Amino acid sequence: MSPSTATFIPTRNPAPALPVVEQSRESRAATFMIAAALLDYPGQEWDDILTEVASTLAQLPAEAAAEFSQFLDWAGERSRREVEEAYVETFDQKRRCCLELTYYATGDTRQRGIALTIVRDLYAAVGWQLDNDQLPDYLPNILELAARTEGEEHELVESMLASHREGIEILHAALLSLSSPWAHVVAALRMALPEVCLLY
């Protein structure tokens, strides 16, 4: 599989350089869980999620906490319906903001089926069963898996994240180009991700 086959729309705004942020395993897991919750569709438990996230920020490095705080400020000033509308407009109506990671590596090609099989094999390897209707490469699902696994299983998930780091960078750049509040969430996530390691 090659990134050259992807059909995403490039952006003109490159992502800023990552700050050097030292994080413990616990703070990285917290970052993954927070990002998973905030990048998922804002359902009925949204207000409770925002409250829980706010109470967790003290566990994170200041740089990551600051990014999440900016998103919380934005979301706190809006009703859940307004956040839902913004979410749909951002992630469901703009292909360049796709939350399905294999899309960035393969586009809508036959190769994507192979890529999705690799992700499904990862879930099977760590004994994890999805409890929603999303595809297995849905970023919030993978982030939750990264937060909840340990040892060799966690290393497998981190390798998967690293292999899709380029797609996450493209997503972040696209969100920045739209001045999307979710750019802050992905910015915080980037600080906790493993180094780039392309498999395709």
Question: What spans do the regions from the language model cover?
Answer:
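Contiguous, well-ordered alpha-helical segments that form the cores/surfaces of helical PPI scaffolds
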Residues: M33-A37, Y103, D137-A147
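Short, extreme N-terminal leader segments that mark the start of a protein/domain
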Residues: M1-S55
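Phosphate-end processing signature that detects enzymes handling 5′-triphosphorylated RNA
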Residues: L122-L135, E144-T149, E153-L156, S180
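Eukaryote-biased recognition of C-terminal alpha-helical segments
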Residues: V185-V196
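Short amphipathic alpha-helical segments and their helix-coil junctions
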Residues: F8-V20, I114-W128, G167-A173
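Short secondary-structure subsegments characteristic of cysteine-rich extracellular domains
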Residues: E152-L175
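Conserved small/polar residues in nucleotide/adenosyl-binding loops
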Residues: Y200
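A glycine-rich, hydrophobic loop/mini-helix early in the fold
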Residues: A65-A125, Q129, D133
